[in-house]
UniProtKB/Swiss-Prot annotation:
EC number of this enzyme: 6.3.2.8
Biochemical pathway: Cell wall biogenesis; peptidoglycan biosynthesis
Record-linked Gene3D superfamilies: Mur ligase, C-terminal domain (3.90.190.20), Mur-like, catalytic domain (3.40.1190.10), NAD(P)-binding Rossmann-like Domain (3.40.50.720)
Keyword Cell cycle: yes
Keyword Endoplasmic reticulum on entry: no
Transmembrane segments: none
Gene name for this UniProt entry: murC
Function: Cell wall formation.
Name listed for the protein in its UniProt record: UDP-N-acetylmuramate--L-alanine ligase
Compartment list: Cytoplasm
GO cellular component term of the entry, any: cytoplasm
Amino acid sequence: MTHYHFVGIKGSGMSSLAQIMHDLGHEVQGSDIENYVFTEVALRNKGIKILPFDANNIKEDMVVIQGNAFASSHEEKARAHQMKLDVVSYNDFLGQIIDQYTSVAVTGAHGKTSTTGLLSHVMNGDKKTSFLIGDGTGMGLPESDYFAFEACEYRRHFLSYKPDYAIMTNIDFDHPDYFKDINDVFDAFQEMAHNVKKGIIAWGDDEHLRKIEADVPIYYYGFKDSDDIYAQNIQITDKGTAFDVYVDGEFYDHFLSPQYGDHTVLNALAVIAISYLEKLDVTNIKEALETFGGVKRRFNETTIANQVIVDDYAHHPREISATIETARKKYPHKEVVAVFQPHTFSRTQAFLNEFAESLSKADRVFLCEIFGSIRENTGALTIQDLIDKIEGASLINEDSINVLEQFDNAVVLFKGAGDIQKLQNAYLDKLGMKNAF
């Protein structure tokens, strides 16, 4: 048994990894800011100690796992180096862990967390699968056959991994504080493709993914019969989305997903492709797909009277469009109200027009002040720059939250990667309901 200390344990990946090591029988603790972060719930439920930052947290027998958000001068990292302890980055440590399993990396600008959550749930319907999901959820199952994990492209972190398979959901320009342009993003994914050992499953309609070259087979999925695996006869029902799957032009089986939206069918196709390639039992896979309950902060719903309140992590224009599409397909007779908190000044600046276009697909838009990050907490623009580009949009905060009560037959989408849950919970308090998020 090893004693691990995680510097920045409330980070979504760090929280998941800490839970995995705890489940595998190791002693685990960590430190972070004292402000509430939703990822800490799972840590506390497993009895994992969360401490405030302090150099005295570092003890002689520890292996220190360092989060990517903190500089090498951080007091705990500095103490660990002074004591000549093993200090391993999150990426390098995860790379070591996955080598013990048949591993499946899920990467892409959008859809990573939802697809990883679905993959882990469905594969566990047939084979033991440990998993690390970017919503702060992780589980280490002793004697697992597989390891499903989310692999982020930011700062090329995913180049630390050499997975057996990689699901590539899409390539898009994001993280403008690091990537120069879409070509820079493509180069990162191209380099990652050469790390994959058995096969790549990629979305067939992505023009950039179609240009990827690899040393292993690439299987494309989508809605066209030119794809290697594709869905047809898609039907929206009161139970979810039903569809037929074809592999290499031959009918494979009929599936039902309890979710809505084209992107959820695409996620399911990627997972079904992995299951097919690994020859998992299709009956077990179908049953597991039908029971998938979603992941944290991805279209999580709470219903109060005729109003559906949704918590979602969407923080990029394409993700915002996807959540609005899901709301319209699932609740076609309700208004869609978007409450959005932009995440980072650089992203807001880079996608200002795209944010305005995607948010305008809602019936009404409310915007919160821009949420900064540890690396970037100021910028040249303000939230008013985005408000001015969306007809009828207005600013909202905890003091004005009761304005949402007027939309009594609506889906209210709270979206963002910052602390928008404070606003959600303030609204739930106004309605006399215990916090659901």
